[in-house]
């Protein structure tokens, strides 16, 4: 039965940036589909009760992904707790806003370190574990509309998210022979901490809502279906694709 292919029972998913917003929404969606969750966040993840309320197991790992130091430990702790990993959701990310003429090297490096460098090396560590298990696996990178467009005032964020889409394609090509699916989700304008400055600007917010065919801000729950699909056997023939969940923004 087709619905059985979406079932994640017995799977273990690592979700970075798991405590709030999009990461929390995807973690809960994966748990509802049957996966046990390893939540990774800069602060100790706070949503253990919500995951366990779905009848799933939860391991919280506190890790600062602005450096590569925690990465091997994340995989090791997950495997020690659950015996395996099957899914990686690379959701952790930061943003810095300023005009390109005034943008600092620190704001450039801070964003690229979290959004692209740590993402790549966490993909690498997870893929090595998938290969050693001999079972394949699923990697879901979180891209952005800025993977497709330029935007303004966020040069390092646009660069990082363009890189995420490119890396997703490259890794998919290299790792498909290992039965590893690497795909990405590009959220549209979502009601999260990252978009709070825009939502607080009535003029800018109104302009955005007039362009989005769905006529509203996206919510974390809007990514759950895409995340479950890309984490499940239903997407086994998908490699290197970036799926926009954007209320129709790119179609406009």
Question: Which role fits each region the language model picked out?
Answer:
Residues 12, 19-21:
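Conserved glycine-rich cofactor-binding loop
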Residues 33-47:
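Conserved glycine-rich Rossmann-like NAD(P)H-binding loop of the short-chain dehydrogenase/reductase
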């Amino acid at each position: 039965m087709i619905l059985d292919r979406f079932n994640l029972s017995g799977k273990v998913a690592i979700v970075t940036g798991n405590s709030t917003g999009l990461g929390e929404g995807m973690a809960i969606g994966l748990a509802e589909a049957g996966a046990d969750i390893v939540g990774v966040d800069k602060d100790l993840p706070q949503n253990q009760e919500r995951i366990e309320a779905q009848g799933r197991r939860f391991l919280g790992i506190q890790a600062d992904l602005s450096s590569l130091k925690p990465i091997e430990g994340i995989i090791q702790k997950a495997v020690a707790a659950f015996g395996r990993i099957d899914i990686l959701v690379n959701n952790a990310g930061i943003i810095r806003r300023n005009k390109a003429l005034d943008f600092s090297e620190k704001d450039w490096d801070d964003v690229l370190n979290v959004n692209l460098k740590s993402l790549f090396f966490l993909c690498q560590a997870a893929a090595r574990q998938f290969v050693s298990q001999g079972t394949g696996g699923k990697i879901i990178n979180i891209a952005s509309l800025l993977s497709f467009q330029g935007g303004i005032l966020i040069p390092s964020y646009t660069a990082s998210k363009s890189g995420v889409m490119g890396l997703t394609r490259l890794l998919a090509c290299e790792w498909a022979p290992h039965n590893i699916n690497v795909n990405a989700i590009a959220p549209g304008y979502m009601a999260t901490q990252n978009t709070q400055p825009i939502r607080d600007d009535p003029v800018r917010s109104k302009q955005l809502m007039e362009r989005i065919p769905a006529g509203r801000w996206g919510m974390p729950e809007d990514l759950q279906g895409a995340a479950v699909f890309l984490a499940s056997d239903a997407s086994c023939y998908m490699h290197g694709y970036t799926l926009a969940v954007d209320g129709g923004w790119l179609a406009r």
